[in-house]
Amino acid sequence: MSFYIYPLSFSLHPLRAMYVIMVYDVEQERVAKVCKYLRQSLNWVQNSVFEGELTKAQLAKVKSGLSSIINEEKDSVIIYTMRDVKWMERENMGVNKNPATNIL
């Protein structure tokens, strides 16, 4: 069993960003659309998981776009937000599906 721990940096942009992890479970016919849409704003981590830094305005835009793609009666999207990523540590157990060399 292998473990990977990625220290995550935090940009000091004037419009302070938050760190976002999005996890989704949508019906098969919408998986590709959701994945393609989220790749525009976040980093793909593994099947149905994206992460990255977004401002509040960017997150609102992503959520608005997602609401036009998903069926809220059948699909699920979970959004985790952290105000300060410096207190977060990412650990990967097992296969690392997207070994990023630069994590935002």
Regions found by a protein language model. Name each.
Residues 68-104:
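C-terminal structural segments of small proteins and small subunits
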